[in-house]
Structures are given as C-alpha cells and as structure tokens.
Amino acid sequence: MLAVLRPSLADLNPDRMWPVYRRYHLLIVSQRDDEHNGALTTAVVDVLSRHLPASRPQLVSAADARRIGVLIATNQQDVAIMQADSAEALFLARPPFADIHEAPLRIIVSFGSHVFVCRPDFMARHAYLLAQTLTAHAEGLPAAATAPSGVVPAHRGAQAFFAGEEIPDD
C-alpha cells in the first residue's frame, strides 16, 4: 500500500496545473515568521484586488526569508515581499543565502523596511502596473510604496514607471 501512495506524495504538481494557475493569478509570497510582512502583504493583495483586479492577486506564505529566496531563485514563484535586508543578502549571496549565487532578483517598489521583489523575467508591463497601482493607492497600505533604491536593482518596468516613461510593451 505504501508503494501506491508514494508517487502521489512525491509529486508536488500531480495534475501539471500549477504553472497554468500561476500564469493567471499573481501569487504574492509572504513571510510567515514576520508579522509586519504578513500585514503588508495582506494590504498589498487588498489594494491590488480593488484597483488592479485583472492581476487576480493572492497571498501565499513561506515559512521564512530563506524559503522565499529559494522559491524566487529556483523559479517556483515570481514575486514576494521580503525585508529589505533579506533581499540584499539574497542578491549578494550572503547568509542565510550564501549557497544561492547570482539570485535573479529585482525590486518593484520599496515599503521602507520591506520590498516587493520579483524575478528579472517578470513582465515589464506588469511590474509597471504594480508600481503604478501601489503608489497611487498608498492610503490602503501600512507604508507608502516608493521607488526602489539600494543594492538590488529596480525591475525595468518599475524603473520605467518611476522615470515617468511610457508603459513597456512586452
């Protein structure tokens, strides 16, 4: 009987629908062990649900910053909210991310102590719209969304928004 159960337990994507679901929903990864992160991510999902409903945002949670880093670096997730220090450590391969070299990481917006991060291959048009929506509706957020700064580069779509350029067409 164990042999029968084993394949279904080992396969985390048994029906192969997870990539399809990710394509049609913006899954924003939150950090379970950071209370402020959870509140911020919940507010971001709420603002996007009301003002950018086509994004179909949903909160998903990871145990800690390390898990978020692994999910982003291995292309299992596209966007997350992390502490700014953790995002910098991931980008620079510093502990607890010392084994994750050249992590593909960009910032869409900064919330002060936290940042909304994504992979560089995240569509520029989508990053632009997220930055635009979150900065325009700061009243719904515990901290205002501002232009990225620091070691981790801004995503090119967010950079275009904050530079006052046209929305990218990718």
Please annotate each region the language model reported.
Residues 53-70, 154:
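Short helix-initiation/N-cap motifs at beta->coil->alpha
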Residues 94-110:
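Short beta-strand->loop
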Residues 74-99:
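A ligand-binding cleft/hinge motif common to bilobed small-molecule-binding domains
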Residues 107-126:
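A bilobed periplasmic-binding-protein/Venus flytrap-type ligand-binding module shared by bacterial periplasmic
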Residues 22-37, 57-61, 162:
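Short, well-ordered beta-strand elements
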Residues 15, 37-53:
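Short, polar/charged alpha-helical segment
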Residues 139-170:
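An extracytoplasmic/periplasmic, membrane-proximal ligand-sensing/linker region
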Residues 1-2:
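N-terminal export leaders
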